Every structure is written in structure tokens, then in C-alpha cells.
Amino acid sequence: MIPTYNEIGNKCALIIRRVMEDGEQSHGKNVWFNNESSQRQVLLAARHLLTYQLQASGDKPADGDDHLVNALVRVAMAIAKRDECGTLSE
């Protein structure tokens, strides 16, 4: 049986709560994000997307589309950084 979007969202919510529970207490500045790299930008983008998903599902108070915008900016930064290093495959 194919899961619904709501079921997928609920699983994502459980995962992000489990993985990022330390991040909630320290505003996301835990060891996972303490390096300057394109990988860090992608991890932060994923966190923003998951936070946006939680807000959209009503599990967290919504503050507009800030997390969605931040996620898109982070991904763009990661792509630009990889492109500068010549590691972006076409």
C-alpha cells in the first residue's frame, strides 16, 4: 500500500523530532551543523523543510513561509559553493 502524503509527513515529523531534539534546545547549533561546507547548507535546508512541514501540518506554530524560503536559499548556496569548487556535475 502506498502511503499518503499525510502519513509520510507524520513519519518525517517523528524523525525530525528524534534527530533534532538537541537542536531545539540549542536553536539548531549542535554538532551536526558546526562546519562550514556545502553539506552543512544541505543539512540546514533539510531542517528548514522539515520545520516547514511540521508547521504546515499544524504541529508547530506557523511563522509564514520563512522556513521554506530559508531552505531554498540554503540549497542555492550549496549549489553555488559546489559549482565554485568545480564539483557540480552537469
What are these regions (language model features)?
Residues 1-90:
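Intrinsically disordered, low-complexity regulatory regions
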